[in-house]
Design a protein with these regions (language model features):
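Conserved S/T- and glycine-rich ATP-binding loop of Class I adenylate-forming
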Residues: 1, 15, 31
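Bacterial N-terminal signal peptides that target proteins for export
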Residues: 1-12
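Bacterial N-terminal signal peptides
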Residues: 10-20
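Noncatalytic, solvent-exposed loop/strand surfaces
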Residues: 24-529
Length: 529
């Protein structure tokens, strides 16, 4: 990100995943729900295409609930919200900033993960994270909490804006301060600040792993990755990147991707890909997983423009433990590297190469992902690819059969695709504001729609519909079919820079400033949360 960026930045039950408690079937417990392949799809039914988000009261950020329709509740967030919603065991988790501070002890800039009651939107607890002293180069002001947690039983795992992987008790401090971490009273205000008394409304940190201290990583402007939990392991991007100069990489030998023990937070292994020296800018992706050739692989979009398939189980090599690269595939085509005269494009030129920020989606043994850049760099060329990882080894960019199809009409994209299993149709968006419907088998475009505003989030497919929002605050609802049919378009009153999700018959949409719980026939409470 460059110094002009003041207010914008982006960041979603399956055999083989061990949950400590049986999930409710219709929960959305992580980025991508219960699917380690991270497909943005829910099998829920009865989700309304039409609703009224309500009107703001005069000279107020409060919404008049009497003007809503099909809205159960609305909760006020901060002033910037890029985090994606997670719903599990009766709790709703959403990351935001500390504007309009809920807790009078903390009135300065902080990152906040809210835990709300799923039925009514009331605050249960909040995780308050102080800003890094190094400032915007690592932790941009007012950006808020970006990571969507992974809820595994009574524990949730997430990445803080301080570049820490944390395990939190889903009950907060309700049952006291549990776990090995006991200093929440000092953690919340930050180093060098007066310690505060821990209350029942505070988060309970079970353990934390500081990636800057332990690994020497240098997050560029923000740490953002939504962890993946597979059996007893946590996989996460480190957010290692450039410094303020946008030329120097302070920590090129630090890992880009790691795996931790979910019980203790101990480092189990790191990637062997040596991505660091080749990072274009920053790394803010989230991993996915799938079984390939009978073994679990972890899929990771690198800051160097390569899609990686790592063996899920680290092996000892020399003095460390490493996730071995099974294969990699370069998403940047040759014509995005040099112009017609052979002169290399200089990053971040609109015609040039991009990294991968979107999450790779594993669906029916294929992987789907697009390339893109920090939105502050503007629009540019893009590429959406479908990869068949079966049998791939080493650099598979030129391997016959690896690339099933490509779609180069898409522009730069940070959206994760959503695929409807009923039709095998893929839906996605790009930063230029276009929504695409593509046949997953052929890569052929079925239709596209211009939302006339930048798209930061991802589409959600549910109940034969596609929900997607844009920077102007418009939420579009399409029929999930080969023929374009716009079912509804409603303005939510503030930018939508995250992804709508569905849990237990309710659609959750978060704008920059509010989160809405939407359900057919819902009667709103009189008072906004």
């Amino acid at each position: 990100m460059n110094t002009n960026m003041m207010t914008r930045f982006t960041a979603a039950a399956f055999a083989g995943i061990a949950f400590t408690t049986a999930l409710r079937a219709d929960d959305w417990p992580a980025w991508g729900g219960s699917d380690p392949g991270r497909n943005m799809y829910s099998p829920a039914k009865g989700i309304p295409a039409k609703f009224e988000p309500g009107k703001f009261k005069k000279n107020s950020e409060e919404i008049d609930m009497s003007t809503t329709k099909n809205v159960k509740w609305i909760a006020k967030l901060g002033s910037q919200t890029y985090g994606n919603t997670v719903v599990a065991y009766g709790h709703v988790y959403i990351g935001t900033n500390n504007a309009g501070a809920r807790d009078p002890r903390f009135k300065d800039d902080k990152s906040v993960l809210l835990c709300l009651d799923e039925k009514a939107g009331d605050l249960i607890w909040q995780f308050t994270v102080p800003k890094l002293a190094s400032g915007k180069v690592n932790d941009w002001e007012y950006l808020g909490y970006l990571s969507a947690p992974f809820v595994d039983g009574n524990t949730l795992y997430s990445v803080t804006s301080r570049c820490e992987v944390v395990a939190l008790n889903a009950d907060g401090q309700k049952n006291g301060n549990t776990g090995t971490f006991k200093d929440e009273g000092q953690y919340m205000p930050g180093p060098g600040k007066p310690k505060v008394e821990v209350t029942a409304k505070d988060a309970d940190i079970l353990w934390k792993y500081d990636m800057m201290d332990e690994l020497g990583v240098f997050p560029h402007n923000a740490a953002n990755s939504s962890p993946l939990v597979l059996e007893d392991k946590i996989y996460v991007c480190t957010s290692n990147g450039q410094d303020w100069s946008h030329v120097n990489i302070p920590s090129p030998q630090s890992p880009s991707f790691i795996v931790l023990d979910k019980k203790t937070g101990a480092l189990i292994g790191e990637d062997d890909a040596k991505i660091g020296p080749h990072i274009f800018h920053g790394q803010w992706t989230s991993p996915s997983a799938g079984k390939v050739d009978g073994k679990w692989q972890i899929f990771f979009g690198g800051g160097d423009g390569f899609l990686y398939g790592f063996d899920a189980n680290p092996v000892k090599e020399g003095d460390g433990n490493y996730m071995k690269t099974v294969w990699k595939f370069e998403i940047v085509p040759d014509d995005y590297k040099k112009d017609k005269t052979g002169k290399p494009y200089k990053y971040p030129a609109p015609e040039g190469p991009s990294e991968i920020i979107a999450t790779p989606v594993f669906y029916k043994n294929k992987i789907y992902v697009a390339c893109g850049q920090d939105p502050e760099h503007g629009e540019g060329v893009g590429r959406l690819i479908c990869i068949d990882p079966k049998g791939l080894k080493g650099d598979a960019t030129k391997t016959k059969g690896a690339l099933v199809w490509e779609f180069k009409d898409i522009k730069r994209s940070i959206s994760t695709v959503a695929i409807d299993p009923a039709t095998d149709l893929l839906f996605t968006g790009d930063y230029s504001g276009f929504v695409y419907c593509i046949d997953t088998k052929t890569g052929k475009l079925q239709w596209q729609h211009d939302m006339q505003a930048h798209i930061w989030g991802s589409p959600m497919v549910v109940d034969g519909k596609v929900f997607i929002g844009d920077e102007d605050g418009d939420l579009c609802v399409f029929e999930a079919s080969r023929e374009k049919k716009l079912l509804n378009e409603v303005n939510m009153g503030a930018p939508i820079l995250a992804t709508p999700v569905v849990a237990n018959g309710t659609l959750f949409v978060n704008t920059q400033t509010h989160i809405y719980a939407i359900a057919e026939g819902a009667k709103a409470e009189e008072k906004q949360k």
